[in-house]
From Swiss-Prot:
Record keyword ATP-binding present: yes
Cited SUPFAM superfamilies: An anticodon-binding domain of class I aminoacyl-tRNA synthetases (SSF48163), Nucleotidylyl transferase (SSF52374)
Name of the protein: Glutamate--tRNA ligase
Keyword match RNA-binding: no
Residues at which ATP binds: 246
Gene designation: gltX
Motif 'KMSKS' region per UniProt: ranges: 243-247
EC number: 6.1.1.17
Main subcellular location: cytoplasm
GO cellular component assignments: cytosol
Length: 466
């Protein structure tokens, strides 16, 4: 029977999650969905000083926005301390780990001496029990660390789904501390216990964890487990080619939401930031899950391109449902001081959205319908609202007031009739109408704008020219 696929996302809640971080959730989520497996969320919060519930909330909020649903969790490492201590005790009892009384000062001196001899600094196994080896009496009043008995000789070998075969000599690895003097377990140990207890089959994570992997594999095997498949993702670089980070100006995932990006656009962009399905650039969430595999993960660092993300967002805005876009855009309009009443927002969105790269830009374009009475520049009024144009404006207003139905087609026909009657070109009449009704010279098609403003508003504002 084939083992059920189980993947995990295991962030540290330190207050900030950017696109590079959330990609380490997206890929294991997609793989679990593709394989009809389970996706687990684990919060690695053992760094008590830097961890916070607010940061956990940001992680959950970011995942919810992208609809990365979880099957189990969130599990919190700080709530599993008793389990870690239990396994530490079992390992000491079984001879897989031992108490080490070497002080920090002694360890520093040892490493300094090794450096002076040109050797790699490492613990020398002084307190490691071996057959026939006599250990000194433990010093009084010293709380020991617990070290894992790393295998001597041989190598740790694994076939990384991204990097290929990796082989690390055990001689490069010293005996890892798995519990501190106060009994708290260390990061690498907690990860191993969690992955075993949660039956994780595939670990898809950033390649900054490659160096941890041989140590984790050795502990897993010592505990009788089978190591998962590892896929170490290359780094995501920012526009300057540096590792993406808050310090280097990366935006948080929720920041993209707040700037007016759509979750489907961010997910589509993220999916391509280190994985490819042929030349496909635009695809749905469902297509992504159907296509995703580990074989096509990129082997080189991916570089963030804001123009590409904006292009994708523009695509999803253009093809998006206008009712949904209206709901999402309204808060942005209100943040600009607009009051959404009068003109039908769904119709306004349909009119203005095609050139917008973000919902903020949609809101900016829509604002002319919702900012109250127009306040056109006096100089522009003087330039365009001339005595010569007044008769045409009066005729237009009268004809618009008499229309049997207020539609774009009827409004357009009325403009053409007035232009023909007075021998005018469209800009000569449209510009003053724009100023009077919208308060600005640049708008979408004038017939569409007037239709959305509504008959009463248009006639009232045109009357101001009289």
């Amino acid at each position: 029977m084939t083992q059920r696929v189980r993947t995990r996302f295991a962030p540290s809640p330190t207050g900030f999650i950017h696109l590079g971080n959330i990609r380490s959730a997206l890929y294991p989520w997609a793989f679990a969905r593709r394989m009809q497996g389970d996706f687990i969320l684990r919060i690695e919060d053992t760094d008590v000083e830097r961890s916070s519930q607010e940061a956990v909330d940001v992680i959950l909020e970011s995942m919810a926005w992208l609809e990365l649903d979880i099957d189990e969790g969130p599990f919190y490492q700080m709530q599993r301390m008793d389990r870690y201590r239990e396994v530490v005790a079992q390992m000491v009892e079984a001879g897989l780990a031992y108490r080490c009384y070497m002080s920090t000062a002694e360890l520093d001196a040892l490493r300094e001496a090794q450096r002076e001899r040109g050797e790699k600094p490492r613990y020398n196994g002084f307190w490691r029990p071996e057959p026939g080896k006599v250990l000194p009496e433990p010093p009084a009043g010293v709380d020991p660390v617990i070290r894992f008995k790393n295998p001597i000789g041989g190598s740790v070998v694994w076939d990384d789904a991204v990097k290929g075969r990796i082989e690390i000599s055990n001689d490069e690895l010293d005996d890892l501390v798995i519990a501190r003097p106060d009994g708290t377990p260390t990061y690498n140990f907690c990860v191993v216990v969690d992955d075993l207890d949660m039956r994780i089959t595939h670990v898809i994570r950033g390649d900054d964890h490659v160096n941890n992997t041989p140590r984790q594999i050795n502990i897993i095997r010592a505990l009788g487990g089978t190591p998962p498949v590892y896929a170490h993702l290359p780094t995501v670089l920012n526009e300057q080619g540096e590792k993406m980070s808050k310090r280097h100006g990366a935006m948080s995932v929720t920041g993209y939401r707040d700037e007016g990006y759509l979750p489907e656009a961010v997910l589509n962009y993220l999916a391509r930031l280190g994985w490819a399905h042929g030349d496909a650039e635009i695809f749905s969430r469902e297509q992504f899950v159907e296509w995703f595999d580990l074989e096509h993960l990129g082997k080189s660092p991916a570089q963030y391109n804001p123009e590409k993300l904006a292009w994708l967002n523009n695509h999803y805005i253009k093809v998006g449902d206008n009712q949904r876009l209206a709901t999402l855009t309204q808060p942005f309009i209100e943040a600009l001081g607009g009051k959404v009443e009068g003109a039908d927002l769904v119709g306004v969105i349909a009119l203005v959205k095609d050139r917008a790269n973000t919902l903020k830009e949609v809101a900016q374009a829509a604002l002319l319908f919702y900012r109250g009475e127009p306040q056109a520049d006096a100089a522009l009024k003087a330039e365009h609202l001339t005595p010569e144009i007044q008769p045409a404006l009066a005729a237009l207003s009268a004809r618009l007031g008499a229309l049997p139905s207020w539609t774009r087609e009827e409004i357009s026909a009325t403009f053409k009739a007035v232009l023909a009657e007075f021998g005018l070109k469209m800009p000569k009449l449209a510009m003053p109408v724009r100023l009077l009704v919208a308060g600005q010279l640049q708008t979408p098609s004038i017939d569409a704008v007037l239709e959305l403003f509504g008959r009463d508003t248009v006639l009232r504002r045109l009357a101001a020219a009289a």
